[in-house]
């Protein structure tokens, strides 16, 4: 009985408000990734876009690999109007989620057979907003709970993230198939409906941010000038890291900068292969 109670106490942490918030925010974070990578390549190939062009379009996903470049700005830069009302973390979360929703609606309004460039720009907006959301969400998670609670928050975050990836992968194909009905062949309207549904799903994250408390912010040193602010936000973190680890810092920073590139650029070509071989109905 004691062991059973111990298990109940362990599982109870996952029903706490903080854990449920991270479940919803994890869903919001995981939703856009496939929609600008694997799922988008599926749509484009079914629309008859050649594989070379699809390969080039995978470069929009490099926003995830290089998000460390603007991470210091997200960490320190206040947003006029929003930061005063929501706080530093929630303001960036809300802005990034609105960017993602707007970008997905932009993608849903396009026909890649007629005009591919607007879709690329919309996908860039989604990728940039998603990468920015990842930055702000990591900071929010770390600052909103004690060290003892971080494991539970990370677990619920990953659960929400993986559920969203299933929805943004298989779920999109299911919605598109329902929207297509009995029509045979490629139907752009089906994909537009599916991406519109995905944009609507971003409401999960937006509502969660608006209802969540802002974590206690850590104090930032005052900056007397723009130059000093830029130095403390962009230069000082890297300088401190290099001072601590010296030559090993270059290896670590290099790995951080490039480890996702192969996954982002090469993994996107799997779905065009499936479309060519078996088609959407059998995937």
Sequence positions of predicted segments:
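Central cavity-lining transmembrane alpha-helices of secondary-active solute carriers
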Residues: 53-80, 100
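C-terminal ends and interior cores of transmembrane alpha-helices
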Residues: 79-80, 91-114
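Short amphipathic helix-loop junctions that connect adjacent transmembrane helices
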Residues: 32-54, 259, 268-280
């Amino acid at each position: 009985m004691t062991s059973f109670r111990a298990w109940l106490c362990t599982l109870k942490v996952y029903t706490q408000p903080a854990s449920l918030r991270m479940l919803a925010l994890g869903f919001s974070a995981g939703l856009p990734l496939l929609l600008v990578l694997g799922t988008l390549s599926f749509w484009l190939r079914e629309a008859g876009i050649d594989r070379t062009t699809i390969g080039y379009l995978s470069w929009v996903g490099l926003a995830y690999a290089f998000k460390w470049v603007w991470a210091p700005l997200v960490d320190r830069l206040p947003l006029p109007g929003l930061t005063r009302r929501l706080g530093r973390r929630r303001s960036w979360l809300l802005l990034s989620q609105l960017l993602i929703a707007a970008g997905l609606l932009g993608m849903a309004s396009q026909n890649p057979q007629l005009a591919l460039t607007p879709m690329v720009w919309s996908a860039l907006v989604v990728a940039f907003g998603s990468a920015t959301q990842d930055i702000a969400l990591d900071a929010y998670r770390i600052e909103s709970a004690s060290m003892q609670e971080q494991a539970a928050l990370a677990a619920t975050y990953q659960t929400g993230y993986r559920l969203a990836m299933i929805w943004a992968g298989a779920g999109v194909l299911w919605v598109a198939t329902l929207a297509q009905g009995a029509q045979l062949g490629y139907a752009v309207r089906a994909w537009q409906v599916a991406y519109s549904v995905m944009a609507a799903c971003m409401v999960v994250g937006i509502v969660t941010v608006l209802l969540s408390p802002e974590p206690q912010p850590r104090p930032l040193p005052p900056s007397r000038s723009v130059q000093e602010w830029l130095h403390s936000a962009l230069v000082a973190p890297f300088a401190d890291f290099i001072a601590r680890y010296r030559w090993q810092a270059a290896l670590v920073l290099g790995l951080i900068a490039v480890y996702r590139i192969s996954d982002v650029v090469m993994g996107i070509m799997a779905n065009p292969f499936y479309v060519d071989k078996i088609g959407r109905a059998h995937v």
